[in-house]
Amino acid sequence: MDISRAEQRILHHLAQGGRIEITREGKAIAEIRCFTRDGWVYPGVDLELFRKLKRKRAIKSSAGKPYRITERGLHLVRSELNNR
């Protein structure tokens, strides 16, 4: 399954140790932020992209923790030298 360039960028950050944190207002998602492994905020994540990655089961959250990349997400992301 092919993934878009924006999805590829986010998955690369997550493969290197990043995370996606969400803020909720009630049940609705209010804010989505992607953090790199160094703690910097990556601005390229919006609600639509987040839902696409979730639908493809490339990211997952467990026990209320931030979203991380899954095994399936690692298979979807193309390897680059800095991700190995």
From Swiss-Prot:
Pfam families for this protein: YjhX_toxin
Signal sequence, start to end: none
Domain of life: Bacteria
Coiled coil regions, renumbered to chain: none
InterPro entries to which the protein is assigned, alphabetical: YjhX_toxin
Family stated for the protein in its record: Belongs to the UPF0386 family.
Protein name, entry field: UPF0386 protein R01313
